[in-house]
Amino acid sequence: MIIGNCLILKDFSSEPFWGAVEIENGTIKRVLQGEVKVDLDLSGKLVMPALFNTHTHAPMTLLRGVAEDLSFEEWLFSKVLPIEDRLTEKMAYYGTILAQMEMARHGIAGFVDMYFHEEWIAKAVRDFGMRALLTRGLVDSNGDDGGRLEENLKLYNEWNGFEGRIFVGFGPHSPYLCSEEYLKRVFDTAKSLNAPVTIHLYETSKEEYDLEDILNIGLKEVKTIAAHCVHLPERYFGVLKDIPFFVSHNPASNLKLGNGIAPVQRMIEHGMKVTLGTDGAASNNSLNLFFEMRLASLLQKAQNPRNLDVNTCLKMVTYDGAQAMGFKSGKIEEGWNADLVVIDLDLPEMFPVQNIKNHLVHAFSGEVFATMVAGKWIYFDGEYPTIDSEEVKRELARIEKELYSS
């Protein structure tokens, strides 16, 4: 299949050119320049690499808007956790379908998830067609985790590598909800399987632990995606740049819960690898990485207008996000995954077209025309080809009534 006769943005550092993309067996076979015979004419559009959301809790779409204007502690312990206690497997499945519907509308091809009922989240990813790195959220009390690590291992054995779209890692929630001994068990398990870890680190100013301890029990040796890192001590930046450590910067969620602004520019200047995430819809409340990208840039520019430039922002949401998750995506090049986004250039905010990359970061609403994963459309011109969206809406209506009737 050849798509194009439109502008092509190959990667974060390139400039758009007129051309087309040939796709075969889920990968990019050729990138063509000039006008060619195509199977799908995308005149008036831009094709670019898809985006990757490196931190979310997908079923929390069901909790969107339930807790507003609260501190982090009030939000989590008084509002969110009591509702989560009522979430069933079916709810997790449809909450994840809904999350993918929203993310696909915003050009996202894959996401990192930490939650429970992860087997049903995996089924939702299987059915919808996205990519995902899935982890079971892990906590313990004096070494007893209620069987959570075994659940995570079962998830790994059953789903890791599925269709080349689903990878499974391990999800210790945070150092304040996991004992040091338990964290070591988790990192040792991940290391033995060559699997990644995702964890919340230094999200709030109240977190008091020494990262040196976590480095020594496994963080140095296991690929890790660390969400937030708002209050990560700068003395560790130099160490973290030399290990397989990726920050997932979640600016909207961090601001909304009053947790502050991560020093992203300083991290990048030290050579650290930084990606972007949305967090869950209960704390954002959107799953729009284009919005997140703009917000991230503006927050850093408050100190210096040269901070977090356009190319850096685009790299964070495409190439860096894909690398963190373990996918050969984020560039339109021969042999790379056909994970693509199509954007309508007739939108008012996309004019003048000569400044297109700037618009993607600082003007675009995030409502894309189409999103492709592994050569298949998961969203195209308002439709979701892989699911029955009307059936999903009916199920979500029933779930809302069940979840909030009491």
Swiss-Prot record:
Keyword Metal-binding found: yes
Residues noted as binding substrate in the record, renumbered to the chain: 84, 136, 148, 173, 203, 279
Entry cofactors: Zn(2+)
Keyword annotations: Hydrolase, Metal-binding, Zinc
Name of the top EC class for this enzyme: hydrolase
Role description: Catalyzes the deamination of 5-methylthioadenosine and S-adenosyl-L-homocysteine into 5-methylthioinosine and S-inosyl-L-homocysteine, respectively. Is also able to deaminate adenosine. Adenosine-5-monophosphate (AMP) and S-adenosyl-L-methionine (SAM) are not enzyme substrates.
Name used for this protein in its record: 5-methylthioadenosine/S-adenosylhomocysteine deaminase
Organism name: Thermotoga maritima (strain ATCC 43589 / DSM 3109 / JCM 10099 / NBRC 100826 / MSB8)
